[in-house]
Curated annotation (Swiss-Prot):
Task performed by this protein: Involved in the control of the dynamic organization of the cortical cytoskeleton. May play a role in the organization of microtubule arrays at the centrosome through interaction with centrin 1 (CEN1).
GO biological process, one term: cortical cytoskeleton organization
Main location: cytoplasm
Name recorded for this polypeptide: Protein TONNEAU 1b
Originating organism: Arabidopsis thaliana (Mouse-ear cress)
Compartments in which it is found: Cytoplasm; Cytoplasm, Cytoskeleton
Chain residue ranges for the region called Disordered: 148-216, 231-257
């Protein structure tokens, strides 16, 4: 390879990189692709009109996409995409997209006009205009966020109400009657009743009276009744013991006589 050929190769590489970096080659490729599609589309129309055969290029997407594009939602979807391509001035891409979607040229404009009138969107185009697809997407996202926020707040309110209702139905119990009552001896013999049980009872009684400040009224009544019952039993035990002692003394005096 001589010097001239080497210099031309370097120049070609430099020009190609520069055009690629500035997007000129991408635009040329898109324009060439669009021109090829337009030529094939015109040929398809001639074949379809003259021979009634299905076109070779129109509707080249899959079956699911064709069914979607035939529905009202699919037509609106294609129209929003075409409106965005037109807004971004991707004209060559738009020329390729429409034939592949089996949609007529500029048919998306009527769809966009009807959608804008029904939903209150403005179609005035200026430097600060935004694509309609972006407005629809942002509106959907705002609605989803509002739904989640409202759902979360309502869920928290329902949980709060349920917890309050549970607290109302089941109030906290400070203590039960069995826990609040003083620890008394279950069985007391007659001999023990007159002895050490008296001091123990007084100690339990003082402890019980100290704890009655925090007792409910019903527990206090039950405790008072139990206290009276125990006092009555102790009185009867002491009385019987005193009578036994007195009877024994009388018998001894009679024996002496």
């Amino acid at each position: 390879m001589d010097d001239y050929t080497r210099e031309m190769m370097d120049l070609k590489t430099l020009v190609t990189r520069t055009l690629e970096k500035k997007g000129v080659l991408a635009k040329i490729r898109a324009e060439l692709r669009a021109s090829v599609f337009e030529a094939i589309e015109e040929e398809d129309r001639v074949i379809e009109n003259n021979e009634g055969l299905p076109p070779a290029l129109l509707g080249s997407c899959n079956d699911r996409a064709r069914q979607l594009h035939a529905s009202p939602s699919g037509r609106l979807l294609s129209a929003l995409i075409c409106e965005y391509l037109d807004w971004a001035q991707l004209n060559h891409t738009l020329k390729v997209y429409q034939p592949e979607c089996n949609s007529a040229k500029d048919s998306w404009k009527s769809e966009i006009r009807d959608f804008s009138i029904n939903n209150g969107y403005e179609l005035n185009r200026n430097e600060d205009s935004r694509p309609l697809l972006l407005d629809v997407l942002e509106g959907f996202l705002k609605f989803e966020n509002m739904t989640q926020v409202m759902g979360g707040s309502s869920r928290r309110e329902s949980e709060t109400e349920s917890s309050l209702s549970l607290d109302t139905r089941n109030p906290p119990r400070r203590s039960s009657a069995s826990d609040s009552l003083p620890h008394q001896r279950r069985s007391v013999s007659a001999s023990q009743a007159s002895g050490a049980a008296t001091s123990g009872y007084r100690k339990d009684e003082s402890n019980w009276r100290y704890d009655t400040e925090d007792m409910p009224e019903e527990v206090m009544r039950a405790s008072t009744a139990l206290e009276n019952l125990q006092l009555d039993r102790k009185t009867r035990n002491l009385t019987s013991s005193w009578r036994n002692v007195k009877d024994g003394t009388s018998e001894e005096e009679e024996g002496k006589d």
